[in-house]
């Protein structure tokens, strides 16, 4: 009998939460086949079987907290029944690791937008992208062409599991096979009639009551990161309206050309390129503080994090070496990383080592905000909603495209004057976007 223990999957974790058990007692499994899905404050991972055999004992269930070293299952593999073998060392490399976040929560839960939202613009939201489901459940639903919004979740935090997909399929098949009886006609309400919604009435004198939901790994990391940022960083925010009319014109001219090559050219791509070039011009913004040793670290790399809202929580994938990429290449990276984040396929390497973050809260209609620094970085740029504004240019009233920018900095190592100069530098690049291609 082989005892399967919950092992450290390579991130120094000590505990996790079982999101879904993928097998049942009596199942015959192959080596490497996924046994269960676990969430931690660092990663999501499907844990594979270290040996082949029949599932004899299952000691876990969805929603259960487990610690490293706990025996989660026992597999009949033909070995000595007294054996207490640990999972094979290869398990760490075989485990399919999917990053949830690393300090991503401190940016704020704003969805990534491939376009900066223009005021009064109407957007369509994909409902399935807002539904909580495990990556495996999403894959099964896609294979079976099942709409996730129609599936009843039974997992922790109202998350859809593979079992829910199968139950939905079974019930749909059963309903389809039943004869359809003609219902008795019911009078339709007149145009002046309204149907009152069902309202749960609570007596005013009733004591305060509430529902409790355990925090998942993403929320635990959010609590830790936001507490760290607000208690340790002396943050200040500077704001500036930026004229991006010329960037708007250039994007309009190049958009179809980029689309012909399969590239979605976005405002965000121009902004990230402008930020990267500005960081190269002003290395005193691209810094971290080693406060224990009273030193300032001037980062050699320019790696830009972008906030992405996903069904599993907020993630901040990183565009590494953004200063060496063209606007078109950055646009490709934005699409690739955003899609991988939403599909739960980001690697830890794609979620770490950011030196500066861009948060596009304009995608939810905000003009200004005070974005929270993603520690250990020292600054973050927030992008507001773009609007068309009449401005006097050389004595002539013109229609201009204005984008509000909000930049939060760690005042311990970045002075307010330098933050202002940086915003002006970004504005200069966006007002003369040809410089971004040089």
UniProtKB/Swiss-Prot annotation:
Residues at the active site: 411
Record PROSITE patterns: BIOTINYL_LIPOYL (PS50968), LIPOYL (PS00189), PSBD (PS51826)
Cofactor, how bound (note): Binds 1 lipoyl cofactor covalently.
InterPro entries in the cross-refs: 2-oxoA_DH_lipoyl-BS, 2-oxoacid_DH_actylTfrase, 2-oxoacid_DH_E2_comp, Biotin_lipoyl, CAT-like_dom_sf, E3-bd_dom_sf, PSBD, Single_hybrid_motif
Cofactor requirements of the protein: (R)-lipoate
Keyword Lipid biosynthesis part of the UniProt annotation: no
Catalytic activities: N(6)-[(R)-dihydrolipoyl]-L-lysyl-[protein] + acetyl-CoA = N(6)-[(R)-S(8)-acetyldihydrolipoyl]-L-lysyl-[protein] + CoA
GO terms for cellular component: cytoplasm
Catalytic EC class: transferase
E.C. designation(s): 2.3.1.12
Residues with N6-lipoyllysine modification: 42
Biased composition annotated in UniProt, kind: Polar residues: 172-181
Residue ranges of domain Peripheral subunit-binding (PSBD) in the record: 132-169
GO molecular function: dihydrolipoyllysine-residue acetyltransferase activity; lipoic acid binding
Domain annotation Lipoyl-binding: ranges: 1-76
Source taxon at top rank: Bacteria
Subunit structure: Forms a 24-polypeptide structural core with octahedral symmetry.
Role: The pyruvate dehydrogenase complex catalyzes the overall conversion of pyruvate to acetyl-CoA and CO(2). It contains multiple copies of three enzymatic components: pyruvate dehydrogenase (E1), dihydrolipoamide acetyltransferase (E2) and lipoamide dehydrogenase (E3).
Protein name: Dihydrolipoyllysine-residue acetyltransferase component of pyruvate dehydrogenase complex
Record organism: Mycoplasma capricolum subsp. capricolum (strain California kid / ATCC 27343 / NCTC 10154)
Gene this protein is translated from: pdhC
């Amino acid at each position: 009998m082989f005892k399967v223990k919950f092992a450290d999957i390579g991130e120094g974790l000590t505990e996790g939460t079982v999101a879904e058990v993928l097998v049942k007692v009596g199942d015959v499994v192959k080596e490497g086949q996924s046994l269960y899905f676990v969430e931690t404050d660092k990663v999501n991972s499907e844990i594979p079987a270290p040996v082949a055999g029949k599932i004899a004992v299952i000691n876990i269930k969805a929603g259960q907290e487990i610690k490293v070293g706990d025996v989660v299952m026992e597999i009949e593999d033909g070995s000595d029944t007294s054996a207490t073998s640990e999972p094979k060392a290869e398990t760490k490399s075989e485990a399919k690791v999917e990053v949830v976040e690393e300090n991503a929560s401190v940016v704020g839960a704003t969805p990534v937008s491939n376009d900066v939202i223009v005021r009064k613009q109407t957007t369509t939201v994909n409902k399935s992208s807002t539904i909580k489901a495990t990556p495996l459940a999403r894959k099964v639903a896609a294979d079976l062409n099942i709409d996730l919004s129609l599936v009843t979740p039974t997992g922790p935090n109202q998350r859809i599991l593979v079992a829910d997909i199968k139950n939905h399929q079974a019930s749909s098949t059963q309903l389809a096979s039943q004869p359809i009886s003609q219902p008795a006609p019911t009078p339709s309400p007149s145009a002046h009639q309204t149907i009152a919604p069902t309202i749960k009435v609570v007596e005013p004198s009733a004591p305060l009551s509430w529902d409790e939901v355990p925090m998942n790994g993403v929320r635990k990391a959010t609590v830790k990161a936001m507490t760290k940022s607000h208690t340790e960083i002396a943050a200040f925010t500077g704001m500036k309206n930026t004229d991006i009319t010329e960037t708007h014109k250039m994007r309009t001219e190049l958009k179809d050309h980029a689309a012909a090559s399969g590239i979605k050219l976005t405002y965000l791509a121009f902004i990230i390129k402008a930020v990267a070039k500005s960081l190269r011009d002003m290395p005193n913004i691209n810094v971290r503080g080693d406060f224990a040793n009273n030193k300032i670290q001037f980062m050699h790399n320019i790696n830009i994090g972008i906030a992405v809202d996903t069904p599993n929580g907020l993630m901040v994938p990183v565009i590494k070496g953004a200063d060496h990429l063209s606007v078109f290449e950055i646009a490709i990276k934005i699409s690739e990383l955003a899609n991988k984040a939403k599909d739960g396929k980001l690697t830890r390497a794609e979620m770490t080592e950011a030196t500066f973050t861009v948060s596009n809260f304009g995608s939810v209609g905000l003009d200004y905000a005070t974005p929270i620094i993603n520690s250990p970085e020292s600054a973050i740029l927030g992008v507001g909603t773009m609007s068309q504004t009449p401005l006097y240019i050389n004595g002539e009233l013109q229609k201009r495209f204005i984008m509000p920018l909000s930049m939060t900095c760690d005042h311990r190592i970045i002075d307010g004057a330098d933050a202002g100069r940086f915003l002006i530098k970004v504005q200069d690049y966006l007002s003369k976007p040809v410089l971004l291609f040089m």
